[in-house]
């Protein structure tokens, strides 16, 4: 008997308050790391009704104009009028950044250029064959819809849309393989004079339909919920407070694999919450691309101030084409998962982070992220004899 189930993932637009916070934190990180690649940055952002608070810890010789950076991010997102729920010109911006603890710094910066993990913790990476970019289909579809929502708003195709929005996609699986889209939920902020029918028609025809047309999957029997509450005028930080690091499942795999709990945005790459999660994706994707397995979950864990991982775990979910112990040995032999090894191999001391802060950190091959490369495939095949 076939094993059937429905799995759901969500995404949010760049104008969602939590994503606004992520983008501000990462824009500050980019500004600093471009001028001081050895900086230590832990930047958190809070957004609420008409104001923004920037907090955290820094160790850098660079000066960052926090107010200007934050306002420019908000402007780029599209909050250019107080009627939208936030205005980049009039919002108050409070800077509460402090200096990094010397106790943490001693453990991170070690002799000989080695870098200890910035904290203890566990991180996960994942890859599967559901899409060409080796990502789970539900989160891939959800991100595609939210990106399209922003695109048609910004290019004027649907001028009455506003920046805040969300999408959720439920996919039917049979024996572990996606076979049909079951339900799509979209909630989007809009101008107050627009009717629900106008919003529903525009979102279906200009956003959802073009996205679905790019996927080879059954779309014949989808249930649609577009602005199911009927009205979404008050949005952005006026509707809900936003905070860095509150969309960690949106940022990763949509719930398709475990999450270690550490957020990404605002953290320089000595923080293994971020860099090791990128490395884990890199490893998992290369294992699947090499044909070692069809699906891979990788866990890596660290102790603060210690460079080498305390554990590496690989789960192929029964899809391995070779002994799993050999796969673990392959990972340990071919991938340097120390913080310095990750930073060097993935070239992470660059201002690349704001681009990651909306629409997911993984599966976005068009952005040129180093952890999405499959340049270890030949080495893996040679090691495993594939």
From Swiss-Prot:
<keyword id="KW-0630">Potassium</keyword>
<keyword id="KW-0479">Metal-binding</keyword>
<dbReference type="Pfam" id="PF02773">
    <property type="entry name" value="S-AdoMet_synt_C"/>
</dbReference>
<dbReference type="GO" id="GO:0006730">
    <property type="term" value="P:one-carbon metabolic process"/>
</dbReference>
<comment type="subunit">
    <text>Homotetramer; dimer of dimers.</text>
</comment>
<dbReference type="InterPro" id="IPR022628">
    <property type="entry name" value="S-AdoMet_synt_N"/>
</dbReference>
<dbReference type="InterPro" id="IPR022636">
    <property type="entry name" value="S-AdoMet_synthetase_sfam"/>
</dbReference>
<feature type="binding site">
    <location>
        <position position="44"/>
    </location>
    <ligand>
        <name>K(+)</name>
    </ligand>
</feature>
<feature type="binding site">
    <location>
        <position position="18"/>
    </location>
    <ligand>
        <name>Mg(2+)</name>
    </ligand>
</feature>
<feature type="binding site">
    <location>
        <position position="240"/>
    </location>
    <ligand>
        <name>ATP</name>
    </ligand>
</feature>
<dbReference type="InterPro" id="IPR022630">
    <property type="entry name" value="S-AdoMet_synt_C"/>
</dbReference>
<feature type="binding site" description="in other chain">
    <location>
        <position position="271"/>
    </location>
    <ligand>
        <name>L-methionine</name>
    </ligand>
</feature>
<keyword id="KW-0547">Nucleotide-binding</keyword>
<feature type="binding site">
    <location>
        <position position="263"/>
    </location>
    <ligand>
        <name>ATP</name>
    </ligand>
</feature>
<comment type="function">
    <text>Catalyzes the formation of S-adenosylmethionine (AdoMet) from methionine and ATP. The overall synthetic reaction is composed of two sequential steps, AdoMet formation and the subsequent tripolyphosphate hydrolysis which occurs prior to release of AdoMet from the enzyme.</text>
</comment>
<keyword id="KW-0554">One-carbon metabolism</keyword>
<feature type="region of interest" description="Flexible loop">
    <location>
        <begin position="100"/>
        <end position="110"/>
    </location>
</feature>
<protein>
    <recommendedName>
        <fullName>S-adenosylmethionine synthase</fullName>
        <ecNumber>2.5.1.6</ecNumber>
    </recommendedName>
</protein>
<feature type="binding site" description="in other chain">
    <location>
        <position position="57"/>
    </location>
    <ligand>
        <name>L-methionine</name>
    </ligand>
</feature>
<feature type="binding site" description="in other chain">
    <location>
        <position position="16"/>
    </location>
    <ligand>
        <name>ATP</name>
    </ligand>
</feature>
<dbReference type="GO" id="GO:0000287">
    <property type="term" value="F:magnesium ion binding"/>
</dbReference>
<feature type="binding site">
    <location>
        <position position="240"/>
    </location>
    <ligand>
        <name>L-methionine</name>
    </ligand>
</feature>
<dbReference type="InterPro" id="IPR002133">
    <property type="entry name" value="S-AdoMet_synthetase"/>
</dbReference>
<dbReference type="InterPro" id="IPR022629">
    <property type="entry name" value="S-AdoMet_synt_central"/>
</dbReference>
<dbReference type="InterPro" id="IPR022631">
    <property type="entry name" value="ADOMET_SYNTHASE_CS"/>
</dbReference>
<dbReference type="GO" id="GO:0004478">
    <property type="term" value="F:methionine adenosyltransferase activity"/>
</dbReference>
<comment type="similarity">
    <text>Belongs to the AdoMet synthase family.</text>
</comment>
<feature type="binding site" description="in other chain">
    <location>
        <begin position="231"/>
        <end position="232"/>
    </location>
    <ligand>
        <name>ATP</name>
    </ligand>
</feature>
<dbReference type="GO" id="GO:0005524">
    <property type="term" value="F:ATP binding"/>
</dbReference>
<dbReference type="GO" id="GO:0005737">
    <property type="term" value="C:cytoplasm"/>
</dbReference>
<dbReference type="Pfam" id="PF02772">
    <property type="entry name" value="S-AdoMet_synt_M"/>
</dbReference>
<keyword id="KW-0067">ATP-binding</keyword>
<keyword id="KW-0963">Cytoplasm</keyword>
<feature type="binding site" description="in other chain">
    <location>
        <begin position="164"/>
        <end position="166"/>
    </location>
    <ligand>
        <name>ATP</name>
    </ligand>
</feature>
<feature type="binding site" description="in other chain">
    <location>
        <begin position="246"/>
        <end position="247"/>
    </location>
    <ligand>
        <name>ATP</name>
    </ligand>
</feature>
<feature type="binding site" description="in other chain">
    <location>
        <position position="100"/>
    </location>
    <ligand>
        <name>L-methionine</name>
    </ligand>
</feature>
<keyword id="KW-0808">Transferase</keyword>
<dbReference type="Pfam" id="PF00438">
    <property type="entry name" value="S-AdoMet_synt_N"/>
</dbReference>
<keyword id="KW-0460">Magnesium</keyword>
<comment type="pathway">
    <text>Amino-acid biosynthesis; S-adenosyl-L-methionine biosynthesis; S-adenosyl-L-methionine from L-methionine: step 1/1.</text>
</comment>
<dbReference type="GO" id="GO:0006556">
    <property type="term" value="P:S-adenosylmethionine biosynthetic process"/>
</dbReference>
<feature type="binding site">
    <location>
        <position position="267"/>
    </location>
    <ligand>
        <name>ATP</name>
    </ligand>
</feature>
